[in-house]
UniProtKB/Swiss-Prot annotation:
Disulphide bridges, residue numbers: C27-C87
Keyword Secreted: yes
GO biological processes: adaptive immune response; B cell receptor signaling pathway; immune response; immunoglobulin mediated immune response
Complex and partners: Immunoglobulins are composed of two identical heavy chains and two identical light chains; disulfide-linked.
A family per Pfam: C1-set
Principal location class: secreted
Chain's role: Constant region of immunoglobulin light chains. Immunoglobulins, also known as antibodies, are membrane-bound or secreted glycoproteins produced by B lymphocytes. In the recognition phase of humoral immunity, the membrane-bound immunoglobulins serve as receptors which, upon binding of a specific antigen, trigger the clonal expansion and differentiation of B lymphocytes into immunoglobulins-secreting plasma cells. Secreted immunoglobulins mediate the effector phase of humoral immunity, which results in the elimination of bound antigens.
Intracellular or extracellular location(s): Secreted; Cell membrane
GO molecular function: antigen binding
PROSITE patterns membership: IG_LIKE, IG_MHC
InterPro entries xrefs: Ig-like_dom (IPR007110), Ig-like_dom_sf (IPR036179), Ig-like_fold (IPR013783), Ig/MHC_CS (IPR003006), Ig_C1-set (IPR003597), Immune_Resp_Modulators (IPR050380)
Name of the protein in its database record: Immunoglobulin kappa constant
Amino acid sequence: RTVAAPSVFIFPPSDEQLKSGTASVVCLLNNFYPREAKVQWKVDNALQSGNSQESVTEQDSKDSTYSLSSTLTLSKADYEKHKVYACEVTHQGLSSPVTKSFNRGEC
């Protein structure tokens, strides 16, 4: 199987979730190979560690690629203290890391 770079998407928390007092930001990587991919979360350019969770789907039988979602979970109060949310993806198929981001309040 040849190397395939992931497509990367970022999703802000939903209004419904924020009403419940938490905020999950999701970074989604689709259709990549090999499985090794690294996701780093940055909030206002500060690297986050420890409050994100990753799950990788097993190889897709149709085209032998993987998908991965990484979820950064914060309290609503923490989420509202910061503005720029970004996930940075490193993968063999990418010549340089790919960053997807959004500004809170501009979605």
